[in-house]
């Protein structure tokens, strides 16, 4: 049965009027989304300014899986002047492996976050000059010809499309053929499989499909009325040849003969998506002249926000998912398809590993033991390095690196000695970090040699966890003055786009070198003894992952098809 979207949009409470219009840059018949325009302007406190000394502000938005954050940044010095955030969740009651959200929730959270950040910054509308958007990668937002959302978005963490990915890979000639055609394997979680899934499982909805967007593209569409996609986020669709930065016609044909007509215009990272359209500007209390940058996926924006804009820098993001990536001057293609050969959002490339289960695992432990974050860390400190042999395979809802789409979480080594809160607390931190190190080992084999890793995300705020990172990765770990790497990166890209629009042809690295600052007080060095212990544990974890794959498949069949649980 075709899924139905809850509603096309739900931007605000009742008492509002509707504004519609044709999507600029699209053929007749394509419409901008139905935008509910509030009668109330955003409550930004009035300020009097000498226009010669008016501040120049940019906004960075990070629309993630669990929440949306907004930062107001001073374009002169890079300082964060205001912050806002709003949380939301996944749709409940879906089959195992399916992960979906209502795009309307992103819009609502974006508006709320921007308003809060503007209030904190005491900003006037005239001061805000540009907006940049970071969004969770790979999600599939299907629009009809009127620009309305057809169904909920399937997300990056959705592993229900494994069969569709296998079918596309087969038409491309298997792994070898896919890597040759795209530079990447077609993995569950990537967008390509989701489109074929819609065609196969919801044919009526597929027939309505007019435009394919990613989450950050959809927010840009709401902001500007333009449907565009920049190269960095597009490279995560498994539809783009990362070497040529062009759509792969062979891959598109493997999904549907008419798919290319449904894809938006590709733009480079230094181009703008447009300017704020009137209806959205009115909702936010901002000017229609505000520049909206190309934006990008959260990893691409995280690279900018951590200063990872020139070869030699490596970033590790410890959020809901985990990613490690490096800036490269040319494509770094993995013949095994385990490392993603993405484009970045600076017109370079971003070899990247992604694990799907990081803070999602530690937060489950914290919740179940009813701990605060400090209580969690205190408990984990009481267990020794290696947790006395208790190990976690953190594949709670499948995994991408290594590619275990049917995986589930496994605690291995449970004994009377290790059946304690402290052991489970530390083993979970160690397990998700070693899950990321599986991919880092592969990156090293492809020529990426990190001596310093810039850590960002919620996990990087823990002193103990930073030490575990340094010991598992065997590299120095540093943090950033601004911890919200993706939102800050979106703000800096917005500034880059603004300067380009003003005729100042500056490089993004000039901006990041000026504004991105390391928190040197939190520099963490690896402990040689701990490094040795973790290398042995890592080897066993990798071996377990391989040996359990057939069992994972049987287990997924048990819980999905046999309806036993």
Locations of the language-model features?
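Active-site core segments that coordinate phosphate-bearing ligands/cofactors
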Residues: 59-61, 162, 169-185, 189-190, ...
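Glycine-biased, low-complexity coil/linker segments
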Residues: 16-17
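N-terminal glycine/serine-rich phosphate-binding loop of ATP-dependent small-molecule kinases
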Residues: 31, 35-36, 42-44, 49-151, ...
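Short, low-complexity, charge-dense intrinsically disordered segments
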Residues: 1-7, 42
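Short beta-strand-loop/turn "lid" adjacent to the catalytic site in phosphate-handling enzymes
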Residues: 119-157, 184-189, 220-241, 265-270
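Aromatic (phenylalanine/tyrosine) cluster motif
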Residues: 9-11, 49
